[in-house]
């Protein structure tokens, strides 16, 4: 039987774990192979329906308990619960702006971890590079300050086989965070988005809830000075 693995914070899936990576056939070309990060754990459900008590043990905290364990589950205070953000990017110049926005507009950026699958060719913008100058010349940029909380799996764009496989690689990088979410590579976040989204999740009173949305057009949607949303309606996809 498998239990909930011990965890730490901050954590990485691409930098210090490369000796644990596994090689698998490329899903689009059997004669080729790809090397991928391993999953965080073997199936802790052991092919049985997990009890609520078991499920609520999963989830890291930015501060350990008195025994030094970061895997505190629902005993972790709301503002210390970690958030995993997976991004699949295909040659998207806006990706680094998205990553910057994630950290810059979070109320508690120290609890965010971003895992990017960056499908690029030589000369493309890189998802974890700062927007303006280098980290050496401008170390206060968000990507520089929180670089240890960003993991990037780089793939040659010609090897891409659509968004599903890229997202699979992204989610292989999950490492026990309390909340997990998926974002496009061209998203602008609103101020205190982390607190807002957790409040929405917890307000449902349902442990099985999944929040999803079709994102609103960025034009006239966010106050550039405050970072707050200027829209208070649901997105409308069709007009009649």
Language model: regions and residue ranges:
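Catalytic cores of eukaryotic secretory-pathway lumenal/extracellular enzymes that build
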Residues: 2-240
